[in-house]
């Protein structure tokens, strides 16, 4: 997908696992994948888990932040950055390596059911903003 979206450099996938129902899982995954702050962090290769939890929080879906686990994945591996709502002692270098790939997945486990949902989007780049800010119809 990055090649098909002008100004996009990465496919960004968000998986939400163990939600109580499909609506909750979809709402959370869509909130994270569409968050401008999260998309900008993905572009900047920044494992900013606070932006992910923030997007989840304003989604309106019910979840317990103290039960949330967040991992980042790509062809370069997997890294757990949040466990039970608390940042892990993860390697920034490894996180940057994972986030440098052209396809990145955030795996979020809310430990509150058996339902999973996945949403797809892209990063938010300077070029994307320029293309769309300068476009005139």
Annotate each predicted stretch with a short phrase.
Residues 1-27, 33:
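N-terminal glycine-/lysine-enriched basic segments
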Residues 18, 26-30, 34-137:
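Internal helix-turn-beta structural module
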């Amino acid at each position: 997908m990055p090649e098909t979206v002008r100004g996009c450099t990465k496919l960004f996938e968000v998986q939400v696992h163990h939600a109580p129902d499909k609506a909750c899982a979809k709402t959370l995954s869509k909130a994270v994948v569409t968050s401008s702050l999260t998309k900008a962090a993905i572009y900047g290769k920044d494992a900013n888990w606070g932006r992910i939890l923030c997007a989840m929080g304003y989604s309106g879906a019910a979840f317990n932040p103290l039960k949330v686990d967040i991992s980042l994945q790509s062809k370069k591996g997997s890294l757990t950055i949040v466990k039970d709502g608390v940042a892990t002692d993860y390697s920034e270098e490894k996180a940057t390596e994972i986030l440098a790939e052209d396809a990145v997945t955030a795996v979020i486990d809310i430990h509150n059911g058996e339902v999973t949902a996945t949403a797809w989007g892209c990063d938010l780049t300077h070029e994307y903003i320029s293309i769309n800010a300068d476009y005139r119809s």
